[in-house]
């Protein structure tokens, strides 16, 4: 396995954060990102960038972090018990975008790199990441295009890559207590190191670089769609699923909280406004029912 180069990964991640923020500002056309740099007592730090109350985006957060620690937290060793007790270095860019218009989907993306070390043993390293889409009023053409772009990103790395990481995304972003997916999926990968550092890093870069290619056309297509209070209330209700998933199941959120990460940055993914409603059921045949009937179970889109 080729030797990992954390400095090269960090340089890419910082540049990716800059480029994604610039792209989102251009899409919004009004609001700007505010940067907030922070340090962590146990080692490392990062920069959170948040755009609020824009013309298109109600809130968009793009976070870079690079943290080190003396012992891997439980969230990171639950499926890798052999790593317990190792020191670690983790870096990544993660983002969540909550649009104003309910016809624009919420989206999340993340790319990350881990190294776990122990004296007298080779370092264990891996890449992870992906992106996923959470529509409120879905359009089939948007979902198919999103998945076609995902497939195109994966294609140079092998025909088996897209179906594998698409399936993993469907399984990961699932709420067992609701028996529904968080959205329409995308890509999710973790523990990526089998092909060696260069190839694994190349795939992580392709996913990070491909995010705006997948998302921007959907924003452009839907940002001027008219909506009213009904659509807004449904958007706020469905945002509740986002909160439920992130606080109950998401490994990244748990990792951040368990490692003494910066709470404001970790919870940047939360929607600025959200509502719950007791025993909500969409009206049969309504646009809201279309989401439940056709988009919250895994499907083959391409």
Swiss-Prot record:
Cell location: Cytoplasm
Region feature (Important for dimerization): 242-277
Binding site for substrate: 94, 110-112, 260-262
Catalysed reactions, as listed in the record: coproporphyrinogen III + O2 + 2 H(+) = protoporphyrinogen IX + 2 CO2 + 2 H2O
GO MF, any single term: coproporphyrinogen oxidase activity
EC numbers for this chain: 1.3.3.3
Active-site residue numbers: 108 (proton donor)
GO CC terms, sorted: cytoplasm
Residues involved in a divalent metal cation binding: 98, 108, 147, 177
One Pfam assignment: Coprogen_oxidas
Pathway: Porphyrin-containing compound metabolism; protoporphyrin-IX biosynthesis; protoporphyrinogen-IX from coproporphyrinogen-III (O2 route): step 1/1
Enzyme class: oxidoreductase
InterPro entries the record matches: Coprogen_oxidase_aer (IPR001260), Coprogen_oxidase_aer_sf (IPR036406), Coprogen_oxidase_CS (IPR018375)
Keywords: Cytoplasm, Heme biosynthesis, Metal-binding, Oxidoreductase, Porphyrin biosynthesis
Record Gene3D superfamilies: Coproporphyrinogen III oxidase, aerobic
Site positions per UniProt: Important for dimerization: 177
GO term, biological process aspect, one: protoporphyrinogen IX biosynthetic process
Cofactor dependency: a divalent metal cation
HAMAP family, per the entry: Coprogen_oxidas
Family according to the record: Belongs to the aerobic coproporphyrinogen-III oxidase family.
Quaternary structure and interacting proteins, as annotated: Homodimer.
Physiological role: Involved in the heme biosynthesis. Catalyzes the aerobic oxidative decarboxylation of propionate groups of rings A and B of coproporphyrinogen-III to yield the vinyl groups in protoporphyrinogen-IX.
Protein name as it appears in the record: Oxygen-dependent coproporphyrinogen-III oxidase
Lineage: Bacteria, Pseudomonadati, Pseudomonadota, Gammaproteobacteria, Alteromonadales
Gene: hemF
């Amino acid at each position: 396995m080729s030797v990992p180069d954390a400095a090269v990964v960090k340089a890419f991640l910082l540049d990716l954060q800059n480029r994604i923020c610039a792209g989102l500002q251009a899409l919004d056309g009004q609001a700007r990102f505010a940067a907030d740099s922070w340090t962590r007592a146990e080692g490392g730090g990062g920069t959170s960038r948040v755009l609020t109350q824009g013309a298109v985006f109600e809130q968009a957060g793009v976070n870079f972090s690079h943290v080190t620690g003396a012992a891997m937290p439980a969230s990171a060793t639950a499926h890798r018990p052999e790593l317990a007790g190792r020191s670690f270095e983790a870096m990544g860019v993660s983002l969540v975008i909550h649009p104003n218009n309910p016809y624009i989907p919420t989206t999340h993306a993340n790319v990350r790199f881990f190294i776990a070390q122990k004296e007298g043993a080779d370092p264990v390293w891996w890449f992870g990441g992906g992106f996923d889409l959470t529509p409120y009023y879905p359009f089939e053409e948007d979902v198919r295009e999103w998945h076609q772009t995902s497939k195109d990103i994966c294609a140079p790395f092998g025909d088996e890559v897209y179906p594998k990481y698409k399936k993993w995304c469907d399984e990961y972003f699932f709420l067992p207590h609701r028996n529904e997916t968080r959205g329409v999926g995308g890509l999710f990968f973790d523990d990526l190191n089998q092909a060696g550092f260069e190839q694994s890093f190349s795939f992580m870069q392709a996913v990070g670089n491909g995010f705006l290619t997948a998302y921007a056309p959907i924003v452009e297509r839907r940002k001027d769609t008219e909506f009213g209070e009904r659509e807004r209330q449904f958007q706020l209700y469905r945002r509740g699923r986002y909160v439920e998933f992130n606080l109950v199941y998401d490994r990244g959120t748990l990792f951040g909280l368990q490692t003494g990460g910066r709470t404001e940055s970790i919870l940047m993914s939360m929607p600025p406004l959200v509502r719950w409603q007791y025993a909500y059921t969409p009206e049969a045949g309504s646009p809201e029912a279309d989401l439940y009937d056709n988009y919250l179970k895994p499907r083959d889109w391409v």
